[in-house]
């Protein structure tokens, strides 16, 4: 079951099942440089979720089941100090500056369907973006 912070962000009750996916990205030298934590609501209507988890990239796991314009993303980008848990995964010191990209996936009706955290170490974090759909 998700912790209180994740339940609050996703606006779900305590007994709601959430799937947590974690991924660490290493540099060529083998140093951990990025850490992703993703939460998606478990839907029994999609029995293939269990078999897809090993192979899917986060939005590809749930979002193809929806029309492209049926959801949007709230994004917050900020600098944070590494918590004890994140420092352990990224093999850095507690408090080391990291770039955090936090995303909440929201359906047009306001229902929150996913939450993602991406931590990047220096000098690997960079910002670049495109807005809207490019045809």
Kindly label every feature range from the protein language model.
Residues 1-135:
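C-terminal all-alpha effector/ligand-binding and dimerization domain
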């Amino acid at each position: 079951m998700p912790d209180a912070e994740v339940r609050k962000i996703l606006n779900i009750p305590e007994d709601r099942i959430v799937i947590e996916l974690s991924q660490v990205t290493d540099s060529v030298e083998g140093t951990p440089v990025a850490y992703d934590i993703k939460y998606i609501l478990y839907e029994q209507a999609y029995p293939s979720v269990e078999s897809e988890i090993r192979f899917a990239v986060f939005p590809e796991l749930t979002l193809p089941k929806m029309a492209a314009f049926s959801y949007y993303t709230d994004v917050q980008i900020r600098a944070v100090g590494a918590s004890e848990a994140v420092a352990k995964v990224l093999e850095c010191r507690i408090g080391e500056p990291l770039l955090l990209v936090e995303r909440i996936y929201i359906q047009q009706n306001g229902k929150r369907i996913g939450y993602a955290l991406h931590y990047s170490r220096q000098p690997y974090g960079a910002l670049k973006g495109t807005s809207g759909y490019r045809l």
